[in-house]
């Protein structure tokens, strides 16, 4: 008895591929990320609020794969720069995107790629591998977010790691 390896991301196992479908999936993940950003808890010790965005980014990448997830996050950031109130607390604008949270937003794009690539190799069907992909994706987000937070706030990297990673 042989078993066939499962490859591809979750969404590809139940839906036929088409450009329209891909566009809807990208728009859906963009919307999911924007909604998750609205679940924001301001923290008194950092300008970066605690949100559900990281979960939306990682889950979306695992479900949709790297290409669609990266496009969704680029669209999300583009909408924010254009003035759509999609960031935490309904914030928007170029100054917000390049502000304290900018590194995390760029991290969303790179984490989407990493988690999406791992998931496209069948990881989205294995809990342990998916968990490891999520941890790796979170590391990517924080590895870009913390230094950017330190730079934009004029604080040390130690302060940024404590206040922008460890406490969140």
Which residues does each predicted region cover?
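Hydrophobic transmembrane alpha-helices
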Residues: 2-70
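Individual transmembrane alpha-helices with interfacial aromatic-anchor signatures
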Residues: 101, 160-168
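Short helix-perturbing small/polar motifs within transmembrane alpha-helices
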Residues: 1-15, 21, 35, 94-141, ...
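Aromatic-anchored segments of alpha-helical transmembrane domains
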Residues: 30-38, 77-86, 138-144
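Hydrophobic residues within alpha-helical transmembrane segments
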Residues: 28, 74-78, 110, 132, ...
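Transmembrane alpha-helical segments of integral membrane proteins
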Residues: 143-158
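Juxtamembrane helix-boundary/capping and inter-helix hinge elements in multi-pass membrane proteins
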Residues: 66, 123-124, 154-159
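Alpha-helical membrane segments and adjacent membrane-interface helices in multi-pass membrane proteins
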Residues: 39-114
């Amino acid at each position: 008895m042989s078993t066939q390896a499962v490859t591809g991301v979750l969404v590809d196992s139940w839906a036929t591929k088409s450009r329209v479908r891909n566009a809807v999936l990208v728009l859906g993940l963009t919307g999911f990320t924007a909604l998750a950003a609205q679940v924001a808890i301001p923290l008194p010790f950092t300008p970066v609020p605690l949100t559900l965005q990281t979960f939306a980014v990682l889950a979306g990448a695992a479900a949709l794969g790297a290409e669609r997830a990266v496009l969704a996050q680029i669209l999300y950031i583009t909408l924010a720069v254009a003035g759509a109130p999609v960031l935490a607390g309904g914030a928007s604008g170029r100054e917000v995107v390049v502000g304290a949270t900018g590194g995390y937003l760029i991290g969303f794009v790179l984490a989407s790629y990493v988690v999406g690539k791992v998931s496209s190799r069948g990881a989205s069907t294995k809990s342990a591998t998916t968990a490891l992909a999520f941890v790796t994706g979170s590391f990517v987000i924080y590895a870009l977010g913390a230094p950017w937070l330190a730079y934009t706030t004029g604080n040390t990297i130690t302060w940024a790691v404590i206040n922008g990673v460890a406490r969140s």
